[in-house]
């Protein structure tokens, strides 16, 4: 535990460098919903400057204000002063926890350590797929495994249809999400995943979750993994899909896949192969609005998170008139499906899920024609 907040040169410079221009207000999904200044990056930088200068005390209110951020990185990309507010927020969250301001994610950290997933589920899924040696190993992540099971089943089915020689493991949470909310990644869980993955003899790890992808690529806990890491869109982009969808299709860029990982083109390459009526929303690629699920925000403020997703759905429908919304992130998928209302006449899938359904439809049509 630390005794006081740390104001090193990097953090001090970031806080002072904020010019208070307010550009971040136009791209912050939480401010867009609440209109409260403290919820955008400028508001947080002003708050932290007051604390740094001793004008405001370190308090529970400061800790709670720091949780009102999805770490979507939109403010960072739109900051003319070159400040990275979401990185400041994440590092400040750790310091606040270190000072004893445990937030509601303390319980999640304990659950992850005890059960190996963020939901406290006691039983692991049996997906009915082989576990053993293979060139590729598929890693699903907590949200897909425990909250979007049907999407995962379709992804597995798609890989089987494409004759991919892959295996699966008894995975546990990568635990990277704990880093976002002020706690530390569980090294023992990382080691368990590494051991299980290396047993397969695989040369490539394919992950369906952009956040897991980032953890495997970026976090020192996984430096000994020794595999080529690919998000599933990177893996699938060169396949020749023999299916088409005639409905108007659009795509939402997940923050973790897009702004954080820089993966924009691969999902679109896949979509354009199967969807001739593909149309982009107005705010897309690095300018896409967040769905409200990231940075622990859905866990801390679930009602507001769903409202943000609902706002994003309305934007997309108004911009595109699409009949099908695709993404490739289990958290985005889960939040959008929870937010969808009757007025949203929109099918929502992960790309892999749609592809599997298209193949299933083609097989059905062939049977009917026979």
Please tell me what each predicted stretch does.
Residues 1-37, 50, 54:
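Long terminal accessory regions outside catalytic cores
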Residues 82, 143-231, 256-370:
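Cofactor-cradling patches in redox/metallo enzymes
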Residues 23-29, 33-36, 77-84, 260, ...:
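Short functional micro-motifs and their immediate structural scaffolds
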Residues 18-25, 72-75, 292-300:
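Cysteine-cluster motifs in flexible loop/terminal segments that predominantly coordinate metals
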Residues 237-248:
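Acyltransferase donor/substrate-recognition loop-hinge adjacent to the catalytic core
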Residues 8, 12, 39, 45-208, ...:
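Iron-sulfur-cluster electron-transfer modules
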Residues 251:
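Hydrophobic alpha-helical positions that pack around
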């Amino acid at each position: 535990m630390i005794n006081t907040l740390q104001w090193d040169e990097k953090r001090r410079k970031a806080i002072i460098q904020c010019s208070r221009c307010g550009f971040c207000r136009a791209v912050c999904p939480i401010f867009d919903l609440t209109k409260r200044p403290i919820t955008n990056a400028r508001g947080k930088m002003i708050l932290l400057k007051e604390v740094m200068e001793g004008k405001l005390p370190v308090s529970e209110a400061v800790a709670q204000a720091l949780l009102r951020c999805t770490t979507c990185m939109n403010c960072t990309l739109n900051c003319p002063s070159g400040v990275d507010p979401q990185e400041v927020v994440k590092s400040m969250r750790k310091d606040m926890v270190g000072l004893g301001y445990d937030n509601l994610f303390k319980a999640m950290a304990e659950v992850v350590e005890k059960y190996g997933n963020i939901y406290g589920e006691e039983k692991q899924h049996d997906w009915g797929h082989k576990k053993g040696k293979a060139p590729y190993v598929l890693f699903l992540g907590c949200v897909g495994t425990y909250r979007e099971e049907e999407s995962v089943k379709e992804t597995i089915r798609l890989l089987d249809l494409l004759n991919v020689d892959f295996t699966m493991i008894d995975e546990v949470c990568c635990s990277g999400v704990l880093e976002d909310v002020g706690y530390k990644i569980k090294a023992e869980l990382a080691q368990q995943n590494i051991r299980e993955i290396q047993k397969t003899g695989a040369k490539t790890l394919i992950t369906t979750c952009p956040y897991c992808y980032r953890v495997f690529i970026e976090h020192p806990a996984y430096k000994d993994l020794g595999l080529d890491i690919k998000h599933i869109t990177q893996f699938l982009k060169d396949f020749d899909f023999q299916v088409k969808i005639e409905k108007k299709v659009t795509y939402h860029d997940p923050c973790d896949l897009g702004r954080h990982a820089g993966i924009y083109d691969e999902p679109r390459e896949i979509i354009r192969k199967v969807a001739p009526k593909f149309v982009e929303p107005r705010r897309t690629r690095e300018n896409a609005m967040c769905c409200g699920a990231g940075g622990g925000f859905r866990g801390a403020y679930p009602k507001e998170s769903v409202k943000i997703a609902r706002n994003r759905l309305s934007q997309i429908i108004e911009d595109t008139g699409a009949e099908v919304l695709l993404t490739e992130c289990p958290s985005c998928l889960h939040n959008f499906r929870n937010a969808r209302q009757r007025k949203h006449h929109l099918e929502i899938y992960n790309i892999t899920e749609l592809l599997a359904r298209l193949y299933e439809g083609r097989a059905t049509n062939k049977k009917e024609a026979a």
